């Protein structure tokens, strides 16, 4: 039905044309151990609108109030799409007390997800299970995400077992895996 479904929140309500009240989920912690409450989200959003080129124009935030698990956002003009914009990847909620560790392609943050980035380089991210993840049991202990410069290198890595899964495999390379029972192809 194309409606936004809250994840870190349990509900949201447009109080009036310039105000949206968001109820945050209880029990969520950042990978740093800090509780994700309205104050933490406020800090993150205030940082976002101060450093991101598009966010101030999309979100139109005048000011934000934090009270426990209730975040109230006041806008300078009606912004009916604000909830959609908050779901944009630039709106990822991170722990600003932890900050951004490193620079550029090596930057790392404390988020709320099932994994913690333990090593970040421009071509690889190593993730380990977040033992304090609020969303249920995390089934895989470690994941390595690699970036490949070209499709041939990606295909070779899959064929040799250097990687166990891919996204963005070149279409003309599907024939190498399509009839092989050792591989499963999922597409949508």
Predicted stretch roles:
Residues 13-23, 56-98:
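Surface-exposed binding/hinge segments that line
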Residues 10, 19-23, 41-44, 71-73, ...:
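Short, well-ordered beta-strand elements
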Residues 3, 87-138, 142, 152:
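Gly/Pro-rich hinge or "lid" segments in bacterial periplasmic/extracellular proteins
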Residues 132-176:
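Ligand-site clamp/hinge motif
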Residues 1-16, 46, 110-111:
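N-terminal lobe/hinge region of extracytoplasmic solute-binding protein
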Residues 57-59, 175-187:
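Ligand-binding "clamshell"
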Residues 17, 29, 46-53, 132, ...:
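Sec-exported extracytoplasmic/periplasmic mature domains
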